[in-house]
Amino acid sequence: MSQPIYKRILLKLSGEALQGEDGLGIDPAILDRMAVEIKELVEMGVEVSVVLGGGNLFRGAKLAKAGMNRVVGDHMGMLATVMNGLAMRDSLFRADVNAKLMSAFQLNGICDTYNWSEAIKMLREKRVVIFSAGTGNPFFTTDSTACLRGIEIEADVVLKATKVDGVYDCDPAKNPDAKLYKNLSYAEVIDKELKVMDLSAFTLARDHGMPIRVFNMGKPGALRQVVTGTEEGTTIC
């Protein structure tokens, strides 16, 4: 088996990645597959942390456009990420993976409150750490959370799992001739106005030299290939 090129990773999973074909809620089969793939990394000696979005359950920004207070909507979105985190932790437990769920704000009796040093300690003990509730502040996306937590825990890379094979020069769903980039610099992403993640998250990663790899989580084995250095997805650094 190929050896991992990363010792510690931050895996960013969108809420939509957890949906079934009906486009709603959480598909247990998808969660179980992800848990098995994460378990494979842990068995290879990789320290794994996870940030989950909440868009499969709730989108605060969308309701804000309909008149809801944005702060209230974002708080509801943060709670949606906690629900996804609970589901992911349960799937990992059932796969015999020791996992810890942390929230950016206190949720006594449900999960631990985020603590930087405790998170690193658990990662060193080969426990999967799931970060939920975003940054704990409104107006920040879960992509920003992924980059922030990745920098804080000194991850080697942020792995952004999507439904496409990487970063393209245009939308591959609309243009079958869209070009897939294998390698990009931070400057190229900004100059070409490529949609990798929101600008706040991306500039945070750039300013701290955090590499980003974008790949298709829907491809079985893609996560392992990324971690072992196979040319999979798009690398930004």
From Swiss-Prot:
Its EC number is 2.7.4.22. Allosterically activated by GTP. Inhibited by UTP. Keywords: Allosteric enzyme, ATP-binding, Cytoplasm, Kinase, Nucleotide-binding, Pyrimidine biosynthesis, Transferase. It comes from the Bacteria. InterPro entries: AceGlu_kinase-like_sf (IPR036393), Asp/Glu/Uridylate_kinase (IPR001048), Uridylate_kinase (IPR011817), Uridylate_kinase_bac (IPR015963). The keyword Membrane does not apply. Its main location: cytoplasm. Belongs to the UMP kinase family. This is Uridylate kinase. It comes from Haemophilus influenzae (strain ATCC 51907 / DSM 11121 / KW20 / Rd).
